[in-house]
UniProtKB/Swiss-Prot annotation:
Homodimer. Part of the ribosomal stalk of the 50S ribosomal subunit. Forms a multimeric L10(L12)X complex, where L10 forms an elongated spine to which 2 to 4 L12 dimers bind in a sequential fashion. Binds GTP-bound translation factors. Keywords: Ribonucleoprotein, Ribosomal protein. GO terms for molecular function: mRNA binding; structural constituent of ribosome. The keyword Ribonucleoprotein applies. This is Large ribosomal subunit protein bL12. NCBIfam families: L12 (TIGR00855). Belongs to the bacterial ribosomal protein bL12 family.
Length: 126
C-alpha cells in the first residue's frame, strides 16, 4: 500500500479538534504510546522525584524566612535586590516569612540569598 504524505496532511488539516483527539487516542491505543510524554517532556522529569525536579527547575523564589537582629541591614539588602522603596522594603521585612523575589534565574536567586544572609537574615531558595 502506497503512503501519500500530502494526502495525509490534507486529511489532518480538514479534521476538527474532536476528530484529532480521537485520532490521538487511537494512535495511543494502537502503538501503546502516550502523547502526554511527547508533548511535555519536562512534566515527566518532575514526576521522577524531588532531586530530578530540583535539577531541572529554571525559576526560583527567594524567601525571607526571618529578618534576624539587624533589620536595618536586611531592609537595605531587600531594597538593593528588589528596587522597592524604604516603606515597602520595611513592610516586607516586618512581614517575614515572605517572598522577596519570584521566578528568577538560579544564579540571581543564589546571589540574592547570599546578600540577605550576609545582612543577617535567614533566607531560603525555593
Amino acid at each position: 500500500m502506497a503512503f501519500d504524505k500530502d494526502a495525509f496532511l490534507t486529511a489532518l488539516d480538514s479534521m476538527t479538534v474532536l476528530e484529532l483527539n480521537d485520532l490521538v487516542e487511537a494512535i495511543e491505543e494502537k502503538f501503546g504510546v502516550s502523547a502526554a510524554a511527547m508533548a511535555a517532556p519536562a512534566a515527566g522529569g518532575a514526576a521522577g522525584g524531588g532531586a530530578a525536579a530540583a535539577e531541572e527547575k529554571t525559576e526560583f523564589n527567594v524567601v525571607l524566612a526571618d529578618a534576624g537582629a539587624n533589620k536595618v541591614a536586611v531592609i537595605k539588602a531587600v531594597r538593593e535586590i528588589t528596587g522597592l522603596g524604604l516603606k515597602e522594603a520595611k513592610d516586607l521585612v516586618d512581614g517575614a516569612p515572605k517572598n522577596v523575589k519570584e521566578g528568577i534565574a538560579k544564579a540571581d536567586a543564589e546571589a540574592a540569598v547570599k546578600k540577605l544572609v550576609e545582612a543577617g537574615a535567614k533566607a531560603e531558595l525555593k
